[in-house]
Amino acid sequence: MANIKSQIKRIRTNERRRLRNQSVKSSLRTAIRGFREAVDAGDKDKASELLHATSRKLDKAASKGVIHPNQAANKKSALALALNKL
């Protein structure tokens, strides 16, 4: 355990951020999985709705610093490509 007051605070904030990042990444994986299942089922309408929702989640995660903006862009591009192949 740290002795310095600022480091004790940093440990607390790091833990809060770690939990937030973990939660956001988990919800991203769930959203992407749902989209891929809709694409595999061939349901274009549902996949289109899920693409919009998933893209929004990716953008929000990138703006909050949970994932890198380029990673969000790459994932959105791959998902859009999968939808367009239907």
Swiss-Prot record:
Cell membrane found in the keyword field: no
Coiled-coil segments on the chain, per record: none
Comp. bias intervals (Basic residues): 7-20
Keywords (A to Z) from UniProt: Ribonucleoprotein, Ribosomal protein, RNA-binding, rRNA-binding
Chain positions covered by the region annotation Disordered: 1-22
GO aspect biological process, one term: translation
Transmembrane segments: none
GO molecular function, one term: structural constituent of ribosome
GO cellular component: cytosol; small ribosomal subunit
One Pfam family named in its UniProt record: Ribosomal_S20p
HAMAP family linked: Ribosomal_bS20
Similarity comment text for this entry: Belongs to the bacterial ribosomal protein bS20 family.
Role, per record: Binds directly to 16S ribosomal RNA.
Protein name: Small ribosomal subunit protein bS20
